[in-house]
């Protein structure tokens, strides 16, 4: 396969069966790590920037400013590098150094906020930067409709195409902004009315199920902001961070 741009390789990620770990069930993982930036957030990074270009909110030579806890920043940094935009990422100082190094490799700059203020503090600081920077634009991933729309246009149809011969019974996914689970559910529910959609969130920050957001990210970073989109979910299991980490280790050891 030949592509004119790395951005053309975003999406169309494979589905991989994890049969050794779940021998009695037909369980598949949609491997979003196959995106060039390593996560599903590449989709929204490209979608939000291109939507802003079409609307005129982001002009050539402009500056992108976004509060992010990690993967969205990587996606935005990759897209900004290809398209020639300056990118300022605002995040709590507690966020992963490894992720920061990757964003830096794409040419992004950082503004780190106090750990105790969490993502709310990062959002407040990002708004200050936008207000004082000519030509600046803030994607606002927690509120941007393009965050949901890209999953209606791409992720949902990809799932439907791969499982057209055998409808899925349930989709289980973690939740950050809510854009992924909302968009996928909106697209798939009309095709598969009996589909159950489950959002999984950490015990330290059970926002969707009615709990309080954590003031600090957990050791295994997860959502800590109470600004998640209303989603089309059937249930919201709350999982302990240690258990989910152990399960991820088992999946890696048994199926790669």
Task: Give short role names for the model-derived ranges.
Residues 1-235, 242, 246, 253-254:
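PLP-dependent amino-acid enzyme catalytic core
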């Amino acid at each position: 396969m030949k592509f004119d741009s790395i951005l053309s390789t975003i999406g169309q990620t494979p589905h991989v069966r994890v049969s050794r770990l779940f021998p009695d069930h037909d369980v598949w993982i949609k491997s979003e790590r196959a995106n060039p930036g390593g996560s599903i957030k590449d989709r929204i990074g490209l979608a939000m920037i291109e939507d802003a270009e079409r609307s005129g909110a982001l002009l050539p030579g402009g500056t992108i400013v976004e509060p992010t806890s990690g993967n969205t920043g990587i996606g935005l940094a990759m897209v900004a590098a290809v398209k020639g935009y300056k990118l300022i990422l605002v995040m709590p100082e507690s966020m992963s150094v490894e992720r920061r190094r990757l964003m830096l490799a794409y040419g992004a700059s950082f503004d780190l906020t106090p750990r105790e203020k969490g993502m709310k503090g990062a959002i407040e600081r990002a708004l200050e930067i936008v207000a004082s920077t000519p030509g600046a634009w803030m994607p606002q991933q927690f509120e941007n409709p393009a965050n949901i729309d890209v999953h209606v246009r791409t992720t949902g149809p990809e799932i439907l195409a791969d499982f057209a011969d055998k409808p899925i019974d349930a989709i289980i996914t973690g939740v950050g902004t809510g854009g992924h689970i909302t968009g996928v559910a909106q697209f798939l529910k009309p095709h598969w009315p009996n589909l159950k959609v489950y959002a999984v969130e950490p015990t330290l920050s059970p926002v969707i199920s009615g709990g309080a957001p954590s003031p600090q990210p957990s050791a295994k970073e997860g959502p800590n902001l109470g600004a998640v989109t209303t989603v089309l979910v059937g249930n919201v299991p709350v999982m302990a961070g240690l258990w989910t980490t152990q399960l991820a280790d088992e999946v890696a050891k048994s199926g790669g």
